[in-house]
Amino acid sequence: MVFKIKDEWGEFLVRLARRAIEEYLKTGKEIEPPKDTPPELWEKMGVFVTLNRYNVPPQTALRGCIGFPTPIYPLVEATIKAAIYSAVDDPRFPPVKLEEMDNLVVEVSVLTPPELIEGPPEERPRKIKVGRDGLIVEKGIYSGLLLPQVPVEWGWDEEEFLAETCWKAGLPPDCWLDEDTKVYKFTAEIFEEEYPRGPIKRKPLV
């Protein structure tokens, strides 16, 4: 895989995400992009910020995850916004408190633009790969997204991944077999803290 995001940029984004959350929890204000932001991070890209509780099994660790699937903001700005939203606006969880940040690991996933999976619906499992792709399912007003790391953490195969993304969208788990359902795939470069406030590493999926 050809990496677009350098390791030092990934480290920059994870540290920025943590600072954005902690400053917002202290002041209620969104921080400005730092003056030393690498110019490449002003390119518009999709990004998600995930907060995981430290030393907890992956299936129960999630504390918040929100982002932008499509490149609508410069990456540095999108990371700040997604970080804050993941901490205080994820409807699945109560807002994060400042003291929790000592026990949360920050993860940033930089996304490629979503690509529509063409062809007959029954061929969709063969056109995706667990450990590489994330998925977006859309039908009517419903949509759902799962990042590439999710099926790896849960041990799903391709069909299970499709079914779970349908479920995330609020649709029946077999909706991926419907021609009216659009399925998109994307890849992500993922960076995470090894432990809260710790060193930052690129996260391999397989």
Curated annotation (Swiss-Prot):
Gene3D superfamilies: Hypothetical protein ph0010, domain 1, Hypothetical protein ph0010, domain 2
NCBIfam families, per database record: AmmeMemoSam_A, PRK00801.1, TIGR00296 family protein
AMMECR1 domain sequence ranges: 8-202
Record-linked SUPFAM superfamilies: AMMECR1-like
Naturally occurring in which organism (per UniProt): Pyrococcus horikoshii (strain ATCC 700860 / DSM 12428 / JCM 9974 / NBRC 100139 / OT-3)
InterPro entries: AMMECR1, AMMECR1_dom_sf, AMMECR1_domain, AMMECR1_N, AmmeMemoSam_A, Uncharacterised_MJ0810
Pfam families hit by this protein: AMMECR1
Name of the molecule in the record: Protein PH0010
